[in-house]
Each structure stands twice: as structure tokens, then as C-alpha cells.
């Protein structure tokens, strides 16, 4: 094939379980076809043999013994909160807590977008989050404050300009790049693209997709030399022109892992993490598939870590932190190659695909115990990634957790040991640097756990979590002081519950603080496990009307529902004006808002 590459010329080619850690002796949906709760499945790989450039020492996918913490600085439709200027204005409070900040895909997508329908790669950075000048200012300001920015990289697929097969023509370093119809996989969109192309005089690649397909846009043929050339140039632009330190690769199951090896070998990012949303074996195989010289060139998100935390929090059974999720241990587990994948595990407890978006797009969220979930996340090995909504709600407490983590010297390769496990609490010890240790206890009765040794000293505690340290004095740990106006409401049964909320003797009831947009009428739907809501509340959906009993300090109306049954329900939903909560575990006297249980009246 002829390379048409010269200055100002177009460049294209035609072509059950035991604990997973050491044991102690004492709508604008992105449409990605990811399973809600993945099990292992390995996509077919028809990639021809490739010989990527040999990586240097810096091209190791993710640093060993890395003690940094990452922030995912967006959620779904966070068009206001994730503006480049808004994020830059928060630099002071992010500094010291977060070492990496992952931001949305920053190119123009041809309209309001979260970035997963990527269109322009080089020449148009007026996105839904700001313009190119604001983006560069954000990255440079972060860099000046020792915060590195992670780019969201979407190269599995690409949006078209005006028809099914045309792409933008863009110039970078005096070279013009343009993808063509033969850069689209032969079996794109189940054959619909090929049918359209044939009818309109175009040809697609002769190669089928090397991974899973996605019908939303054109899946790129990464065997195409033109695609590889343009992707390499794109990554060079992100890293060496815009100033990103690393990449978060979207939907990496859509193409062979060997291409990530090629691209990272060429671009040499300091950090690389792939979204391989699947079971642990598939994630591990993907990491292995990025190897060059037997060295992985990328980390991956530890989805199974997230699912174990979800299982424990949502089911109020903290033993599940020490159990497999549908036969999958987390990557950080000792049962996954003796813990050898911890270096390449980016852990998290919520992201934009799992969060609660709306009543009609509830996803698979954490329903309660956000603080306990983050306390566990920030105590464990792997590189923790905190979700923006969680940071916004609990900045001071999360910042304190990170401060303890860093003071103890916990890294992505630290060794955890299970110290206690029962339904009410789970305790894990993690060894940091210089034999300093952190003991994290989470669960509904976390405060009732007493460490076996008096050498443990409590350093911080909150709603359903306690941190103890050993080998370092609590007074030696400096906690950040966020501006008072930015302090979040504490997630505690004693904070934020109005005094007019009371529970009578033997009364089965719950309280709901409703957002003003939910209207003046709130209904309650409750049910027993295996039972029917209509049977329990005595009426059809949307249930029985709750009584408005007062106004909270923030102006929201507070409603009370009292059961007429002798037995408490297992689950509850509040709804109003077309909005509704997720299915929530019923707690007698529980004080809820749209995010879940905030506390218990009288406790």
C-alpha cells in the first residue's frame, strides 16, 4: 500500500467463598453493550501477528508501589460540574488529596455529549465542558500543583460527519489525517453498514472486528495501518501537545488488547487503564494481552472489587467483602495470582455507568453506606478512583481517609489481611511503608469492633467506618482543612434529622426528605422479600400517600410513612411527580432522601 504522507498532504492507507485477601490466624445513554454484572467471556481475536515497539522502563502500564489516588471528575450528564473552568477553580482543595484526575473525553462530538460519540481528535476542542484554551489551562494548573490529568480515550468506535462512512479531515504537525470507509470493520453494525456502503459505492475493510461490536457508531478496524497511524498521532497530541499524563481507554473489549500494546509502546503514557467490564479472568487476560517483553502496558479497572463492595453495602452483609462475586475474586485479591495483579488494579466503588441516573435509568448503584464503601476503597491496595458525586457529598471525610492512607504509606501493591468478618462489620489490616499499618473496620456495627492489640490507635471514624493506625501516631497525620463553606453534611444518624421526627413505641415507620422538584405529594411503596407491594401497602402503585410532617433546615419537605402491618417490610421506595428512589432496604425509623438512607431516628 502506498503511504501518502508529506507536509500538508492527506495521510491514509487503503487497507462461596473464602476471603480474597490474606487470612489472619486470630438519556443520552452511551449504549455500550456491557453486562450489568459480567461473567468471564473472551471475545474472539482474529488479529494478525503484530510486533509492537519495545517499551522503555516508563511504559509499564501503571507504576509499581504507586501511592497515588485518582478522582473521576465527572458523572453522567455532569455538564455543569465538570466544566474545565469549574474543575480548575477547585485545584486548591484537590491538591494533596488527588494525584490523578480523570476528565471526560475533551474533543468536540458535534453536539452536547459526554464524549463517547467522539468525532474530532485534533482540531476542534470546543466541547460540552469548555473550549481548548480552558482545557489547556486546567491541565497546566493541575500540573503546577502536582496533579496529573488522565484523558478519556475512545478509539473503539468513531462518529461520522455526514453519512455512515465519512470522517473528519484534520491536521496535526503539518500532516493531514483522515479515516476512510475501509477503516471500518467488515461486520460493523451486524452487516448494516456494509449493506449501506455497497448500495452507495463504498467499501469497508475485509477484516471483521477483533473484539465485541457496538452498533452505536462505526467500529474501527485496528488492523488498518491508517487507523494505527492516526491513533498513534492522536495519543501523541493528547500527551505531548495538550499535556495529558495518561489514558483511560474506553470499551477495550471492542478490539484486541494487542493494539493497546502497540499504542502505548508508541505513546509511552505514564498511566494507562482500560475499561474491561467483565469477570476477573477476562480482565486479567486483557492485561496480559497488553504485554510487551512480558510486561503489561496497561492497568484495568477492578470491576469485581466494585461488585463485592456493592454486595456488602446494599445487602447490609459485610462478610461479602471477603467473598467472590459470582465466582470472581477482585484483582487485588491474593487468590488472583497471589496478588500479583494489584499493581494493575484501579479500584472503584461507583462510576458513570453504575450510578443512579434517574428513575428511568437507575443502573446498579450503591444504595447506601457511601462513606463505608469509600473507607474500604481507600484502605485497600490497588489505585483507588473516587467518584465525583461521592467527593462532592463527603469532601472532608474522604480527604481525611486519603490523608491516613498516604501517611501510612499504602500503595497499589500493599498487602491486606482479614482480621474479622461477620454480617455487622468487616475488619482488614493493610501494611504500608516502614511497617506502618492501617486497620479499616466497616459495617453497621463497625464501632463495636475492638482491635486485639492496644498498639492500634483510632485516628478517624464516621458513619459505619473506623480507621486505626499502628506504627505512627495519629497526631502525626495532618488532615486537610477544607473551607467551611465546602464542608459536606456528615453521613450520620445524628446529623440533618429534624427534631420533629419521632418514632412511637412499637411503631413501624420511615421518613423521607423530598427534593422540591418531587412535589407536595409523596407516595410510599413497601414490600416483603418474595412478596408484593400492593399486598403490603394495601393499594396499587404508586402506593400509599405519606404524611408531610415538617420542613428540614434546607427547605425540603419531610414526610413520614407508618405501616399498618404488624411486621416491618424488607424494602421501601418513595416516589413523587414521576420521580422515585431506587429499591432501598427498609430500616425502622430510617431517615431517607433521594440518595438513600441518611440515618435512623432515635439513634
Label each PLM-derived region with a short phrase.
Residues 130-163, 169-172:
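Substrate-binding cleft of carbohydrate-active enzyme catalytic domains
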Residues 515-566, 578-584:
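Aromatic-rich carbohydrate-binding modules that target alpha-glucans
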Residues 197-231, 236:
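Glycine-rich phosphate-binding "P-loop"
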Residues 52-83, 213-224, 509-513, 518-523, ...:
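Boundary/entry segment of secreted carbohydrate-active catalytic domains
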Residues 112-122, 157-203, 265-266:
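Aromatic- and acidic-residue-enriched segments that line the glycan-binding/catalytic groove
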Residues 51-76, 86-95, 105-119, 136-147, ...:
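Active-site-proximal helices and loops of the catalytic beta/alpha 8
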Residues 578-603:
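Structured interaction patches on ligand/partner-binding surfaces of diverse proteins
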